[in-house]
Regions:
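Leucine-rich repeat
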Residues: 9, 30, 54, 76, ...
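Consensus "Asn ladder" position of solenoid repeat domains
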Residues: 6, 24-27, 48-51, 70-73, ...
Length: 209
């Protein structure tokens, strides 16, 4: 169901019960509760981008939802990700996230694709992504990251692609990339890398991989 750009300030109450894909981008959904989607038991993909969204209240069980797009909104904090057991893709790009809590994604352990680019993240707790054993793609590009904890990627056994471009990173801690883990792609461009002995680990890792 395509409700893009309809100047909506609330979710339409008369959506077909068998809706699988719901496009609600470019509306005026400033504050929203996932309770609004409870009648849509088969809902798999939900696009809420470009709404000026400042608050998303979760908790209602949406058992089939696999993809949630929250990009280009005004979220200052990551919503609690409750009631989304099947979620595999989450996009919160181009919001105003300044921090992530440890274990922020423990309730969505099937997540495979996490897009956090274009926020205001300056640092991350080492447990930011704990529990995401199925995660394949992690995009942290175009934030304000100045340093990253050594253990950030530990436990992300399936991670294939990592974007760190466009941050303020000058170095990475020794052992940052898990020993023996093979990545398909790692993007490190557009950072002010400080070329001294502290960067020896990163240089060696690049040459080996």
């Amino acid at each position: 169901v395509n409700c893009t750009g309809q100047d909506l300030s609330a979710v339409p109450p008369d959506l077909p019960g068998d809706t699988g894909i719901l496009l609600l981008s470019a509306n005026r959904l400033v504050s929203l509760s996932t309770d609004a989607f409870l009648p849509l038991a088969q809902l798999q993909d939900l696009d809420l981008s470009d709404n000026g969204l400042v608050a998303l209240h979760t908790g209602a069980l949406l058992p089939s939802l696999r993809e949630l797009i929250l990009s280009r909104n005004a979220l200052g904090a990551l919503p609690p990700l409750q009631g989304l057991p099947a979620l595999t893709r989450l996009a919160v790009a181009h919001n105003s996230l300044a921090a992530l809590a440890p274990g922020a994604f423990l309730t969505v352990q099937r997540l495979q694709d996490l897009d956090l680019r274009g926020n205001q993240l300056r640092t991350l707790p080492q447990e930011a992504f704990v529990g995401l054993r199925a995660l394949k793609d992690l995009d942290l590009s175009d934030n304000l990251l100045e340093e990253l904890p050594k253990e950030l990627l530990q436990g992300l056994q399936k991670l294939e692609t990592l974007w760190l471009s466009g941050n303020r990173l000058q170095t990475l801690p020794t052992g940052f990339f898990p020993e023996g883990h093979l990545f398909a792609y790692v993007f490190l461009t557009e950072n002010p890398w400080h070329c001294d002995c502290d960067l020896h680990y990163l240089r060696s890792w690049i040459l080996q991989n």
